[in-house]
From Swiss-Prot:
This is Calreticulin-3. An alpha-D-glucoside binds at residues 118, 120, 137, 144, 327. The keyword Endoplasmic reticulum applies. It comes from Arabidopsis thaliana (Mouse-ear cress). Molecular calcium-binding chaperone promoting folding, oligomeric assembly and quality control in the ER via the calreticulin/calnexin cycle. This lectin may interact transiently with almost all of the monoglucosylated glycoproteins that are synthesized in the ER. Required for elongation factor Tu receptor (EFR) accumulation and for EFR, but not flagellin-sensing 2 (FLS2) signaling.
Amino acid sequence: MGLPQNKLSFFCFFFLVSVLTLAPLAFSEIFLEEHFEGGWKSRWVLSDWKRNEGKAGTFKHTAGKWPGDPDNKGIQTYNDAKHYAISAKIPEFSNKNRTLVVQYSVKIEQDIECGGAYIKLLSGYVNQKQFGGDTPYSLMFGPDICGTQTKKLHVIVSYQGQNYPIKKDLQCETDKLNHFYTFILRPDASYSVLVDNKEREFGSMYTDWDILPPRKIKVKNAKKPEDWDDREYIDDPNDVKPEGFDSIPREIPDRKAKEPEDWDEEENGLWEPPKIPNSAYKGPWKAKRIKNPNYKGKWKNPWIDNPEFEDDPDLYVLKSIKYAGIEVWQVKAGSIFDNILICDDPAYARSIVDDYFAQHRESEKELFAEAEKERKAREDEEARIAREEGERRRKERDHRYGDRRRRYKRPNPRDYMDDYHDEL
């Protein structure tokens, strides 16, 4: 027996909605999704770069000091003043005719002082055991901090073998909580940079990187045409100065003033009332201002097509990607990298960030606040002990020097003089 008509219609509707909802996911492609769960060491190769010099650091698999989820572990830089390099090989792909999404999370738990927390996409063959700072890359993206002044968010792309940093001044987060950084590059060469799913910057590779010459340039030595009227307002030609306007005095005699009773005309002359401001005086006459009907706007140097510009429709296309890597140097270690995603679906990347914040953000903040409270109490106690120790040492020093002064006190010559005078 078949389904009733109304149930069959509902089933068809539900099936259609499901297909439409899942269709984008079915056609999206994930090239790398790494949450550093079991077996991650088999996927990632720790480089020996700088190891012979004793300058190579190691990574620790941990959730950190204030994890939103203690079971969600990443890899943390572990040794101070070291170079870190680790990479994973991924199925080779090209972003030609597709959107590229690069996303990861990093929690900079430490007072880093100076160091990077970015990731790189690599092309061609890479000896992963020798992967280091001089290894060519196709994209470098993420925070770089040094002191209190530099809090830069790098977006560096490689074009024809040369690296080009973004011209805009992008800032990274420094509050010791977990943050997601997302870079989206589209086939029309437009891009977006997101931090925690909030768009921090957007634009075009044509304008925000100095890769190609600009499409338009200003005309050199251009001059404003003589008939160009850039006066937005002009005097009203129909406004006429009232008759007698210029004869109105600025001040007039005070009519309420009275001659003093003791005024002596022979001695002081004829009394005159003091002057007061004239309320009828309007100052110099000025015609009313009206909109200029011939106003053409402020003159600007005209733009023309740049003869040196040659378009590259593949400007957005990176060399085929084969590896993802972390290569940084840090004065103070302690940054946790996690949730690395390389795909072509911005919606899927957004869902990962949304899920993390919905499930773990509040607990992470609570643990961080508690850790900060304990740190503050510990520092206050250490400061108290240091003050008490300093006071104790000061008292000992004063006591010791006091005894020495009394022991080696020099006689006062006046004492001898007094004895001499007494004898006299």
